[in-house]
Amino acid sequence: MKVIHLISGGDSGGAKTHVLSLLQNLSRTIEVDMVCFMEGPFAQEARELGISTQVYSDRNVLRTLRLLKQKIREGGYDLIHCHGARGNMMGAFLRKSTGLPVVTTVHSDYRLDYLGRPFSRVTYGTINTLALRRLDYRIGVSDAMVDLLISRGFDPDRLFTIYNGLDFSPRHPAMDRQAYLRSVGLEADDSCVIAGIAARLNPVKDVATLIRGFAKAHAACPQLRLLIAGDGEQLDMLKGLAAELGVAGQVCFAGWVTDTNTFYQSLDINTLTSLSETFPYALTEGARASLPTISSRVGGVPYLIDHGVNGLLFSPGDADELARHLVALAQDATLRHHLGQRLHQKAVEEYALESTVRRQLDIYEIILRRQQRPHHSRDGALVCGAYGRGNAGDDAILEAIVAELRHLDPDLPVWVLSRSPQDTRLKYRVNSIYTFGVPKFLWRMARTRLYINGGGSLMQDVTSHRSLWFYLFTISAAKRLGNQVLMYGCGIGPIHHPSNRKRASRVLQKSVDAITLRDTHSLSELEDMGVTRPEIVLSADPTVILPAAEPEVIDGMLESQGLDPHGRYIGFTLRPWPGFEEKAELFGRAADYAWETYGLTPVFLPIEKRLDVAACKRAAAYMKAPHHIVEDTGASDHTIGLFARMQVVVSMRLHALVFSAGQGVPLVGVVYDQKISSFLSYIGQDLFTDLGELTYERLTGQIDAAVRRIGDVQFLSGGVERLRQVERRNSETAAKLLGLAPPKP
């Protein structure tokens, strides 16, 4: 593989570090050449690192383009990789004339690159904005940068994420801590706790908030000191602010620091106060030194720092919150050690330079593989379901379906019908169309190979006749427009109205190629409706394949809710439904019973926040025992992880039962819909009661029975393991309809 990199050559900061370290390491594996458009320290340093570097400094763009075309034609390159405005402009011109795929790395928000320079913003900024749209692929230097690009309409299928890699090999400071602090002018003895920041002193870095927060924290912790490494236009203002707040003697401005190893080794706390970031090197530098970190919650920072688990986050500009975090760390050396060690471990695993190099090579291989992919008039899959409504169960279904499609064909274009297309694009990195944007999704259907009617209970008329008619319409349209049609891990029924049953039977019989079902009741329902033509396969709910988040992440979530990670809990998931109001008191009293009898703290966990939180509060209003309502359970892996920490789960929601069953938690189901009893029967569990027949005695009796099952691994895991085995039939059926090889175990 041979790649040519195009960059202006005037870059500094994180972009410079990223490009030079990446190219130095890539050149050990593949052929890499770099072209700069100006001579200077960047090009000189690249040569010193052994990177093949050539400078085309001619200001005549057309002449430079001719030279580049000749170099690329004669050099036998496979791919063009651009960086920055000038590189992107050249890449956009070279794309068609060379026939090579062109990718760019977006190092920063291109709309902010020329703030304060109106002429450059109008010229270079406009050119860069246009050029970015003309390139084939884009790489964001953090997940947050990719999110930003998606929000601005860039195709998620043509975006990649890479992080600024760091060499985590052991580093040795040039001098000891006390000597270094004296050398930069900070008076501090061994009892002092040193907080620090390395940043340009400009408005975006918002060091003023750090000084304000430090001054408040210093009043409570006089042993605190602040070391600021960096320079910029705000230096004098910041010095004046420190004096005004009475901490000039405890704040040291060290200027630009070249010996970053010794700087970070001299700190006790690393900080970042930026108003905007992609993914700052300052955090991984601090992580390399195992420093506990306090950072503003911006850009890609939350992808590295899990609040309360391996660091502390605060809202940008909030000096009071920052001060509280500084005080907490200054007063607790053990907490500093634990947070620093956890951050170091995560950074080594995910952000080491070796990982960055491997990721870049993977991206090149993906791009070249896609270039070889046959281009047909039809490609990809369109997925339709109850998505984009904030229901954790439906979101988990989509996550599982997308994961299984990517496993079958990592380059398969995936489109999703969603009530919130923007949220779906950001969350799942897929293209999305508004669910009821009929012209748009019909246009897409004419170009896809597979239409998936997603998992869940879409074929029912209990909640709505119109939703059933809509889903049947999309199935018919997809088949008429030339798609293979798959109903994926779904439930069927109840469909009560005779005309609806007749319509559903006709459409499924005529327009569906295969149906994979999540339970035996759905199989019986299809038989009763006379649906026989499609291939019908008994499988399982797709979400049984999803894992829980790492234990330390769930520990942090529980701690942030004021809950002991090692506590004993009973989970309740409730939803509004006809008849629930009359039974709400029973749930509250049963929760009290679990607390009084077994010492289980009731925790209410919603699946669909906009509906379930109110139902949980309604039941909790009848309680006397201590309890907690988690109003937002987060992403699917977080939600599953929270259910895994329950000793028993009582639920009206199907996916609370599915998530809990997958983690071996004893279950009590309250049946408002046949899907609850169907699932529990399917996995061999018998503790469930119809909502209308629920009594206090029956509910507490089933809680007693569930408590007795705690620790019965064979019973609790047996049915779910069988589900995970048969769930493979979902993706096997999809592979068959797409003409792909079946998935590997």
Predicted region positions:
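A conserved mid-protein helix/loop that constitutes part of the nucleotide-sugar donor-binding site
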Residues: 13-24, 193, 197-219, 233-240, ...
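Nucleotide-sugar donor phosphate/pyrophosphate-binding loop at the beta->alpha transition
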Residues: 62-66, 101-103, 111-134, 147, ...
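Conserved acidic donor-binding segment of nucleotide-sugar-dependent glycosyltransferases
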Residues: 307-308, 312-319, 328-333, 687-694, ...
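Active-site anion-handling motifs in enzyme catalytic cores
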Residues: 369-745
